[in-house]
């Protein structure tokens, strides 16, 4: 039983959550640096970071941030508190409650880390001048929509895995992925220009566009 194992090994589960969060942060910085090196071949408008909450932090190029440490510590404390709630005889909550909480974070981070790995490999390949001819510039709304579709597929996968397993871990992942996909879709709609504005913009990429990748930190 996945939920039971996660609860029994709560310290390992909590450490994994924190490590995944920090890995996401580090890989986002690495991706932003790599993207700048291939901006003449591949770029999108706006920030490399697709989560508005972290855009300024990534754009600043500063690696150290008390905010990052605060979020990492908060995740550990919250999951630790949830684990205490599922102790036998307390509040009547079973290990499924902890499994759900762990799934909310870990199964959202899974597609995010996969996207980071894909982006870094793409930028490495594009660093070869013979890899492509010309360049491609993506509008931000389109990348948001692609990100929403990407995370949605994982949400459906976790839901399908829950059906035979009946483990709350997968329900947690499905909930977080579906909610994040909805958020990305909303951001995409907000960023999409009107039809007349789109015609005025033309096909060229703006010179001041910041390279980015479809990451979901």
Can you name each region flagged by the protein language model?
Residues 2-217:
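Hydrophobic alpha-helical segments at protein termini of multi-pass membrane proteins
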């Amino acid at each position: 039983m996945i939920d039971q194992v996660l609860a029994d090994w709560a310290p390992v589960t909590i450490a994994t959550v924190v490590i995944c969060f920090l890995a996401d942060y580090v890989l986002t910085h690495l991706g932003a640096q790599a993207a700048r090196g291939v901006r003449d071949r591949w770029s999108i408008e706006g920030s490399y970071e697709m989560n508005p909450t972290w855009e300024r932090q990534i754009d600043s190029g500063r690696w150290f941030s008390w905010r990052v440490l605060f979020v990492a510590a908060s995740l550990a404390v919250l999951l630790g508190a949830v684990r205490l709630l599922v102790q036998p005889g307390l509040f009547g909550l079973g290990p499924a409650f902890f499994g759900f909480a762990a799934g909310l974070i870990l199964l959202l981070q899974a597609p995010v880390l996969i996207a980071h790995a894909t982006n870094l490999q793409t930028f490495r390949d594009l660093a070869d001048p013979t890899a492509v001819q010309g360049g491609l510039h993506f509008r931000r709304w389109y990348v948001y929509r692609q990100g929403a579709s990407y995370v949605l597929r994982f949400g459906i996968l976790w839901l399908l895995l829950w059906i035979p397993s009946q483990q709350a871990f997968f329900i947690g992942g499905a909930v977080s992925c579906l909610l994040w996909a909805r958020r990305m879709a909303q951001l995409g709609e907000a960023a999409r220009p009107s039809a007349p504005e789109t015609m005025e913009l033309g096909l060229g990429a703006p010179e001041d566009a910041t390279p980015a990748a479809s990451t979901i930190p």
